Amino acid sequence: MKVAFAGTGYINKIHARAARNCGLELVAVVNHHAESMAQFAADFSIPRQYKTVEAMLADGNVDALVVSTPNYLHAPQTIAALEAGVHVMVEKPMSMNAAEAEQMCEAAEKSGSTLMVAHCWRFDPEVRWLKEHSGKLGKIIRTKGYGVHKHWGPSGWFTHSEFAGGGAMADMGIHALDTVRFLLDDPQPVSVYARIGTYYKGFDVDDTGLIIVNWENGVTSYIESGWWQPHSDGAEAATQLYGTQGFGQIFPTKLELPNATEEKIEIIN
């Protein structure tokens, strides 16, 4: 499979290493910053460089595209690739808003190509360990999730609504939301309460957020997001499951069962 990359930042470097380790052929990179694009191409022995996704698609010979660019580019770059018959993995958040996300899904359905959002935590070994063992907790009643940076936050386009669409909730809270959906077998929401605010920096996006979701299976999820927070009740990407027979969590990952013993995670190398 021939893979191209839109964006040359930290996350796409991880994706490129993973693709190379899987034996995929890295054929093209897209970025309007020539210097960083040239360095990315050199680091991963990528032969083709382009300023736009459209120019790359016009030359063809690409099977899949990894989109890891500022959020406002996710929808147009993804839709262009799907319409060209190219599979797409797009970084989170999927888009700037729900309308764009629906357009992306429609393009995937019409083209027959695969569209995937890169929600990475559901593939983490510790998350999968907790899902595998969550049956020991009985009926899950509620969950708590945290997508919080303490004493730190991003800069650049992340903090501008015209480029990012949202702030800490779209950047960090979305990890906690997708993780709990995975642990609960991807239920549909019945009701959602959400509140965001900006308190710590002069951004025009949120640096603090809260979501409460009532799911169709009767579980209630509480999710916090934040940048520059002075404190968090959980680790940066922690998720906690409260069941009738016990408690489980990731980061640190463990089960606490009714007999007061703890079953800690197996060592995963």
Predicted regions and their residues:
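Contiguous beta-strand/loop segments that form the cofactor/metal-binding neighborhood of enzyme cores
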Residues: 178-254
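C-terminal helical cap and adjacent loop that interface with cofactors, partners, or active-site loops
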Residues: 249, 265-269
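Predominantly a Rossmann-like dinucleotide-binding segment in NAD(P)-dependent oxidoreductases
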Residues: 121-203
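Beta-loop-alpha module in the N-terminal Rossmann-like domain of NAD(P)-dependent dehydrogenases
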Residues: 15, 44-107
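Basic phosphate/pyrophosphate-binding loop/patch that engages nucleotide-derived ligands
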Residues: 106-114, 128-141, 242-243
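N-terminal Rossmann-like dinucleotide-binding module
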Residues: 1-44
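Hydrophobic residues in well-ordered beta-strands that form the structural core
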Residues: 5, 50, 67, 90, ...
